[in-house]
């Protein structure tokens, strides 16, 4: 067969398209680029040291997932393997390390031909605040945590189906509570003291720890604030940490 390599290549594309057609839906929300004050301001009494100083940040536009990555999507991409302790297709996947997530994203991109990634910490916070539609809530979407989050007061210490609480100003769910979410950044303390905005920051790449954000089902309210920060070594797996996807506005 003279055109056997071409035939194989075409079949590979067809099969990949077929597999992608069966994949669980990934809904993305467009976040318009803009400038915001990142970190905890003096008007809040429950700031942690690692949230200060508040500093101006300017971001390009991007996309971020409406929901946390579910166990259904994880198993589809990873061949049926589910690391989560509490099982349910529509529950957020947990017990995934930062390294596990990078493997998942690579496989997902191979399956779909797209360029998904983790959000940066700045992108995560800007989206959690509601982007350029922000109403400056303490939590993502409300000053009343019960409205928008599963946390220690209402969760029975278990993760819940994604998207069952009220969304924030951009229509994004669960950015406060349910499960923490890995970001792409290495952790570092804020040291930006200029009045000029820091543009598209990506964190400290040489850091031994990675950032995760948002609070979880066992968290106290202060940890679910949009400015609250956490960190861990990238090979750590927790029952309360998952992630959500992001994508450049114009992926090349």
Predicted regions mapped to residue ranges:
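Bacterial N-terminal signal peptides
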Residues: 8-16
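Short, solvent-exposed loop/turn elements at domain surfaces
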Residues: 36-47, 71-73, 84-85, 219-226
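Bacterial N-terminal signal peptides that target proteins for export
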Residues: 1-8
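GGW-centered surface loops in extracellular recognition modules
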Residues: 22-32
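Short aromatic-cysteine micro-motif
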Residues: 23-24, 48-132, 153-173
């Amino acid at each position: 067969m003279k055109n056997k390599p071409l035939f194989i290549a075409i079949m590979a594309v067809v099969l990949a398209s077929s597999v992608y057609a069966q994949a669980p839906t990934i809904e993305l929300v467009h976040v318009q680029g803009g400038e915001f004050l990142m970190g905890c301001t003096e008007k809040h009494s429950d700031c942690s040291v690692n949230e200060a100083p508040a500093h101006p940040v300017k971001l390009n536009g991007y996309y971020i997932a409406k929901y946390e990555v579910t166990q259904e999507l994880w198993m589809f991409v990873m061949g049926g393997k589910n690391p989560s302790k509490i099982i349910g297709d529509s529950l957020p996947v947990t017990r995934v390390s930062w390294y596990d997530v990078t493997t998942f994203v690579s496989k997902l991109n191979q399956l779909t031909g797209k360029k998904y990634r983790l959000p940066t910490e700045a992108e995560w916070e800007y989206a959690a605040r509601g982007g350029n539609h922000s109403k400056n809530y303490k939590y993502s979407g409300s000053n009343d945590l019960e409205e928008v989050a599963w946390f220690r007061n209402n969760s029975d210490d278990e993760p819940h189906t994604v998207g069952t609480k009220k969304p924030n100003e951009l229509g994004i769910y669960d950015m406060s509570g349910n499960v923490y979410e890995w970001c792409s950044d290495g952790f570092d303390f804020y040291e930006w003291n200029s009045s000029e905005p820091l543009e598209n920051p990506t964190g400290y790449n040489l850091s031994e720890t990675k950032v995760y954000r948002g609070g979880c089902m066992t968290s106290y309210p202060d940890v679910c604030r949009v400015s609250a920060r956490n960190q861990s070594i990238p090979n750590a797996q927790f029952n309360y940490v998952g992630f959500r996807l992001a994508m450049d506005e114009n992926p090349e």
